[in-house]
Amino acid sequence: MKNIEKSEIIISLVDVDKEFGDKKVLDQINLDIKRGDFVTLLGPSGSGKTTILRLIGGFEWTTRGEIKFNGIDIKDVPAHKRDTATIFQDYALFPHLSVRGNIEFGLKLKRIKKKAEEIPDVVWKKFEHLKKKWQDKQKRKIKELKILQAHLEKLLENPQLDIKKRKKLQDKLDDSDFRYSNWENYLTSKSESFKKKYLTRKITKQEINKEITDIIDLVGLTGNENRAISELSGGMKQRVALARSLVIEPEIVLLDEPLSALDTKIRQKMQVFLKKIQQKLGLTFIFVTHDQDEALQLSDKIAIIRNGKIAQYDEPKQIYDYPVNKWVANFIGDSNFFQAKYIKKNQVEILGLKLYTIHDEFIPGQKLDCLIRPEDIDIDLDSGYFKGKVIQNIYKGSYYSLDIKVENTIINVETNDFYDLETQVFIKWDDDAIHLMEMENAEI
């Protein structure tokens, strides 16, 4: 497999819009993904997360905006020419082929670099000559398009344009943007075609056998090479799909809710397995799910998608502990929300009580949303911030989920201890358990 270093940004989405007819499904998506990261696109059904994945994979075209791969816009590059592999929810395996046959399928088109001594000098000279021609043509075409785009953008600044003319100009600008992307990729495309023809060779049968043996061992399918797909469990099918994607050595693996059809135990095992494989190979994984726990466990970073926009993009712990708003907090985990008032630096009022907080970035008197996670609340029988009584007790296997009524407020608490209904208790928390955020349209 490739030795891939985790460092620079490999994929960037810049001001990406996607429209289906009159419906805008993605709105100004900006997203940078580093090489070697496991990034999850998390959101409810219909939020646009799968559309983002399909745009990166080349299965959909952007309406406008850029999709940059290693700094070059590839939005007009077809799926089969992108250095990606996709694992679908239904696995998309070939039922008429065995495990080995499915994995071998992509390898048959693979090319191997020739050794330097196998390539005549005349071939290198020809390549350098053609490369100069391609570069000159690329520069000329890009310059022409820049002039055209500047002209169209100037025309669009006219506030007196009617809707019909504005749309016509915008369509021309969008079209020129796709042509710009095409010419940005012109040199790379021509160079790759030349290299494939003159600088590479077909993979041999012996090399195919070795690569298949190595990948089957990597994904834990040794001994199942000749089994039919219909004989496999869901977890094993997922491993075949993963092996088929990895064996072609893509830079990016796209995973569209690949674990959603598995039962809980197999799903948990596959989560661990996927993360282990990704870390071992150092590949970039872009993973779509609506399962919050799955995203938190697997990801280096999570992009939370809501109504076609990125609500928050950060490391899992940062999103869980410091959500940007109430919606994100509720979506990513269980929450207790209180209306709070910022008193002064490091002091906030919650349920009429002034408490210490680590927050110091707000304005005195500012109304805020206050988040406290259920697992951050402690129960004491003798003392605490607030006194209440247990009105609900649900056993969750590894903990108890309690609802505690404090005056007219219901507070959810997770605890390892059992408490009878109607038990009088006190609740409290550490200073850093208070997470403050601005209220939407809040007034000071």
UniProtKB/Swiss-Prot annotation:
Primary location class: membrane
Transmembrane segments: none
Keyword Membrane: yes
Residues at which ATP binds: G43, P44, S45, G46, S47, G48, K49, T50
Reaction equation(s) it catalyzes: ATP + H2O + polyamine-[polyamine-binding protein]Side 1 = ADP + phosphate + polyamineSide 2 + [polyamine-binding protein]Side 1
Domain ABC transporter span(s) in chain numbering: 11-332
Membrane topology: Peripheral membrane protein
Gene3D superfamilies tied to this protein: 2.40.50.100, P-loop containing nucleotide triphosphate hydrolases
Family from the record: Belongs to the ABC transporter superfamily. Spermidine/putrescine importer (TC 3.A.1.11.1) family.
Subunit structure: The complex is composed of two ATP-binding proteins (PotA), two transmembrane proteins (PotB and PotC) and a solute-binding protein (PotD).
Protein name (Swiss-Prot/TrEMBL): Spermidine/putrescine import ATP-binding protein PotA
Species per Swiss-Prot/TrEMBL record: Mesomycoplasma hyopneumoniae (strain 7448)
Name of the gene encoding the protein in the UniProt record: potA
